[in-house]
Amino acid sequence: VLTQHEVKIAPSTYYDARKRRPSARQVSDERWKPIVLGCWQRQRRVLGARKLWLRLRREGHDIARCTVERLMRELGIAGVRRGKRTNPVDADPRETRPADLVDRHFARFRTNQLWVADFTYVWSWSGWVYVAFVFDVHSRRILGWRAATRMTTPLVLDCLEMAFWTRRREGVADFAGLTHHTDAGSVYTSIAFTDRLIEEGIDPSVGSVGDAYDNSLAESQIGLYKTELIHHEGPWRNVDQVEAATADWVQWFNTERIHSSIDDLTPIELEQLEYALTEPLEQAG
C-alpha cells in the first residue's frame, strides 16, 4: 500500500515490522479487554470508568483506573449520563399539610431515621406507568416500591407498606422517631397516608410547593432509576414489563451498585457495617 502511494520503504524495515512481536502493553490490553467488557455488561452497562474500576477491584482484579478509562475508550463503551427530571407535582393546596421537618438537612440523619418518598412516570406502549419509591436517606437503600397504571393514594400506601415489611423482616419493631419526608403532592398529603404514618409513630414531613430541592435526595435517586433502567433499556410494553425490570434493578441497586456518597459502598453493605458496629455497643449497654 505504501509503495502504491510512492512512499519509499526498505524491504528489511517492512519484514521486521511484520515479524515484530506484540508489546507487553498490547498483550496486557488483550487480556484485560474481555474482563473489563464482561464486568461492564454484568453491571447493566451503566457504569462509568470510576465505578467500573472500583467494581473490578472488588472482584480481585489489580488494574489501574487509567487503564480502565483507556480500555473503555478502545472498546467503545461508556457509562450512562443522567438527564433532567421534569415530572410535575400535583400539589395539595391545603395550608394544613404537615410541616417540613427536614429543611434540606438530609446529612444529619442516620439509617432508619429519615425516609424519603417520591414517584415517577414511565411511558409504555400501553399507556403511562407510575412507579413509587421509598428510600432510606442515610444508606440510599430502596425500602419499598410499587408500579401501577394510576397514580393514587393506594399506590403510595402500598409502597409504604412494603417499606414497613422490609424493615420488620430485619427485626425493626418500632418506627417511633422516624421521619417520612415527601414533596407536597396530593397523594402524600392525603388524610389516609398521613394517618398511616401517625399510626406507626412516624413524623410526617412535607416540603414546600414548587421547590425541587426540598425533596432533592428522592429526586436524585429516581433520576438514577430513569437513567440506568428506564431510558437505558426501554421502550416498554406495559406495566408488567416495567414492574419485572424494576424488581431486578432494585435488587441490583441495593446489593451491587456502589455509591460515592456512602464511601463507595452498596446500601446493604453500609447498613450491615453500621449494624455490626452498633450491636456490640447495645449489648454492652
Spans of model-derived segments:
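Charged DNA-binding/catalytic regions of mobile-element recombinases
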Residues: V1-G285
